[in-house]
Amino acid sequence: MTIPPLALVRQTIPQPVLADAPGEIRRLIQSSGLSQRVPRGGTIAVGVGSRGVHAIASMARATVDTLKAMGYRPFIVAAMGSHGGATAEGQRQLLAEYHVTPESMGVEVKTEMDSLVLGKSPVGLPIYFDANA
């Protein structure tokens, strides 16, 4: 077998920086029209995953704090599949490693593995989400 000639390829992916990411999160949530779709006092699940979000704990906390300030009762759900060994306890531990805990977030963190199909994607694939949500 002959190996064809190889060439070095380098890709630089742009990584924009937000000067005030928590402030941008607040602005986006407040301008999202959420209050027209969910009544004050309603519960809202905040999905927190494990796929390389920089400063994920501060992003999650900004989301939770904004929702609380708007009169909602947020809680966090693990938004990951096989990470954490695909177990509730493993995902709870993984979130804790990212400093996402009930104590640090000020809300409940639910990592049960039960999920429901919410609908289908434009290409017909099922969309699953945490049953607690």
How would you name each of these model-derived features?
Residues 1-25:
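N-terminal amphipathic/basic leader segments beginning at the initiator methionine
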Residues 29-45:
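Glycine-rich phosphate/diphosphate-binding loops that line cofactor/substrate pockets in enzymes
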Residues 70-92, 104, 111:
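Active-site histidine-anchored catalytic micro-motif
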Residues 90-133:
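An acidic, phosphate/nucleotide-engaging active-site surface
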Residues 54-73:
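Histidine-anchored nucleotide/phosphate-binding helix
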Residues 22-32, 60-63:
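Short, well-ordered amphipathic alpha-helical segments that serve as non-catalytic structural scaffolds
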Residues 43-52, 75-82:
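Short glycine-rich or small-residue beta-strand-to-loop segments that form or flank ligand, phosphate
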Residues 53-60, 85, 117-125:
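Short glycine/serine/threonine-rich phosphate/pyrophosphate-binding segments
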